[in-house]
């Protein structure tokens, strides 16, 4: 394929990669062309990266809490979408509440799935509402679900943490 000057394009994997063993996987991005590039310095592939495969954690996290999102004085929920590749049972949601979150804030975890046929968002389950103690702020905690949720292969889930309290800060990494 040819890309004309000033145009952009995207590259996609034709064969998906599924890790087969527990460990760290390193991803290096490279590009090769059969023509001379006039300005190779403007080719952007993004940084190389690595990810870990573990027995029990599926996370979107770089391991360094370096910011937060908050709700000001409003109720809110924040989370991520997760594609599930094998049937799994989930028992809790890990989260970190940033410094400045008021002690006593009421928080919870909730999980929805995207119906693969209709595209509707369907409630699946949640944790009990807890009141945050001082020792639960600026540290990773697990919000245990009221009962385990069986996640289905091939389904996308929206895993979120929410609050009924003002000024709650959910760490970002």
PLM ranges: what are they?
Residues 1-22:
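Intrinsically disordered, low-complexity Pro/Gly/Ser/Thr-rich segments with frequent PxxP/GP/PP motifs
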Residues 125-127:
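Short Trp-Ser/Thr-centered turn/loop motifs at beta-strand boundaries
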Residues 42-117, 151-156, 162-173:
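Beta-sheet-rich sandwich/jelly-roll-like modules and their strand-loop junctions
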Residues 18-51:
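Terminal connector regions
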Residues 10, 35, 53-54, 116, ...:
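Coil residues (strongly favoring Ser/Thr
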